[in-house]
Amino acid sequence: MKAPAHRTTEVALAATLHARGRRATSQRLLLHRALLELDRHATADELLRATAERLPQLSLPTVYATLELFEELGLVRRVPVGSGPVLWDPRPDPHQHFACRSCGRVVDLEARVRAGTAMAAARAAGHAPDGAQLVVMGVCSDCASAGAHV
């Protein structure tokens, strides 16, 4: 019998944490599972609500600290979208995003855009870039067909 997918993911997460000298706490395992189960870009508040029933003692600072650890380990990506709350992406692989100015939805784009030009411009300005993300802004197809304009 095959192990449930979330169990396999938890084993892999625990191995990654241990390999980096970190403990695989129940909070870390649950937060990672919640982000994967939401299957979308989520805020720390949304993750706190998604885990509240199973871990009522979990606090928002712990959620943020855990997400930052996951980002450091390459397990999630922070998505820079406007001035709203930070969104966390369960897909750490390189990809771009589209953010709707009308409904706020953020979706993955599968186009492969090279960040080399932006990185070179940052270096030319004296900065030391270590990564780049592209977020395309506009009105999503659902809002556009409903007549939304921004």
Residue ranges and their predicted role:
Residues 63-73:
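Basic amphipathic alpha-helical segments that dock to polyanions
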Residues 59-60:
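Short coil turns linking two alpha-helices in DNA-binding domains
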Residues 29-34:
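Pre-recognition alpha-helix immediately N-terminal to the DNA-recognition helix
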Residues 8-21:
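Short, Lys/Arg-enriched N-terminal segment that forms or immediately precedes the first helix
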